[in-house]
Design a protein with these regions (language model features):
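Conserved FAD-binding subdomain of flavin-dependent enzymes
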Residues: 72-113
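Short, solvent-exposed loop/turn and secondary-structure capping segments
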Residues: 64-67, 197, 297-302
Length: 417
């Protein structure tokens, strides 16, 4: 959807690109970004689905937008997306993706109606003393100095923020405020993280600021995001004949590099453990998602903790990005993002209640019936005095279509792990 002056151009269908039926696309990974690109290739690019190839190293699509019932582990969600009105690309796409719940409507219709009928807001943003109200009371707690520090960061040139941590630009006037409690737990920021990243988040989500204390700016799906978002996209792509190649790991991309030219020439991949090559031409498009946020994740269980593995997994997205970047500086600097995992990792857990012991505590804190099928916590609840700076949430229940009646499935994460 293209916005210019008014909406004259917004709803017109693109002209079919000349020769598109002779082109092919290879998408490395099957997370939300790759699936979105594939959907746009089908809808707007009008590329035949049989010419679109999604190469995924796992046996299932979705990337970080997961939600799965693992034998012996139970329900697992590694994270969740907090969505708002200004996800323009996503909403433009989902108006064209048919619902898998209701015939004749789109995913966007379904999502919009749900959040109109059951708007999101939190009645308890933070607690202390094991469940008592922390009385953030919708306030930011910022002094004039703190507000000026945030404003100064917003207008600082990017180049002046290279290699600077947040503690170089914010004093205790910000770092001890409610604003920072809201922000850091919502976006998983540590004090030592990048000041430039903080600035970029401020610019991208400035419209969130008014809704930070109670999450009124946010929207959530009915079920976990694999079932509510990824599955409808998969059904749409499969219906158009898009080719999915699971258990297929792209380990390298070779390039034809000359002055004024950078063209992918070959994909090197492992399919079920055997090496293969795909030679590329000028009629082939390649879409990469290097450096995924769950690329190096590891699962624990009821009996053992999730192992911390500081080394990058060989043959993964980060490893591939490093190989590509070594060939040309224009391909970025991945080590800026992955060289200090002890400073960037965090731990999450999916919890399933099997009896009636925990739900009353959830209800007492969030002040809503968690079994109502409506908004429960309305976003994360942060235990302000937790050594982990632990936050937890229960979204609309059930979170999984096959979730047994009487159970709750929630998500917990510790910023300090």
């Amino acid at each position: 959807m293209y916005y210019s002056s008014g909406n004259y151009e917004a709803f017109a269908r693109p002209v079919k690109p000349e020769g598109v039926e002779h082109k092919s696309a290879y998408l490395v990974g099957s997370g939300l970004a790759a699936l979105t690109a594939a959907c746009y290739l089908v809808r707007d690019g009008q590329m035949p689905g049989r010419n679109i190839h999604i190469l995924e190293k796992e046996p299932i699509a979705g990337g970080a937008c997961d939600g799965w019932h693992y034998e012996g582990l139970g329900y697992v969600m590694r994270g969740g997306r907090e969505m708002d009105n200004h996800f323009e690309v996503m909403w433009d796409l989902f108006r064209s993706i048919p619902s898998i719940e209701t015939e004749g409507v789109s995913v966007l219709d379904e999502y919009y109606w749900l959040n109109k009928r059951d708007p999101n807001y939190s009645l308890m943003r933070a607690t202390v003393n094991r469940g008592e109200d922390a009385h953030t009371d919708g306030k930011f707690g910022l002094s004039d100095q703190g507000a000026m520090e945030i404003m100064k960061l917003f207008f600082t040139p990017d180049e002046a923020l290279y290699d600077k941590p947040i503690t170089d630009v914010f004093s205790s006037a910000v770092l001890e405020s409610n604003f920072w409690l809201y922000w850091r737990t919502m976006f998983a920021f540590e004090n030592w993280h990048s000041a430039l990243e903080m600035k970029l988040y401020l610019k991208r989500f400035i419209h969130h600021v008014g809704g930070l204390p109670d999450f009124t700016a946010l929207r959530f799906t009915r079920y976990n995001q694999y079932e509510s978002m990824i599955l409808p996209m998969l059904k749409y792509l499969e219906a158009h004949g898009v080719q999915f190649h699971f258990n297929t790991r792209v380990v390298d991309v070779e390039f034809d590099l000359r002055p004024g030219r950078k063209q992918a020439s070959r994909l090197v991949l492992l399919r079920d453990g055997a090496e293969e090559h795909i030679d590329l031409t000028e009629n082939d498009l390649v879409f990469l998602t290097p450096g995924g946020c769950v690329e190096n994740s590891a699962l624990g269980s009821q009996d053992s903790p999730a192992p911390f593995r500081p080394e990058l997994k060989p043959g993964g997205g980060w490893d591939m990005w490093r190989r590509i970047a070594a060939r040309d500086p224009a391909f970025g600097r991945p080590d800026k993002f992955c060289s200090q995992p002890e400073l960037s990792n965090w731990m999450s857990a999916t919890v399933t209640t099997l009896d009636d012991k925990i739900p009353p505590y959830v209800q007492r804190i969030c002040q809503r019936d968690p079994f109502s099928g409506k908004v429960v916590t309305g976003g994360i609840v942060t235990a302000r005095d937790s050594n982990w700076l632990l936050s937890w949430t229960f979204n609309r229940q059930p979170q999984f279509r096959d979730q047994p009646r009487g159970q709750l499935v929630g998500w917990i994460y510790g910023l300090f792990s």
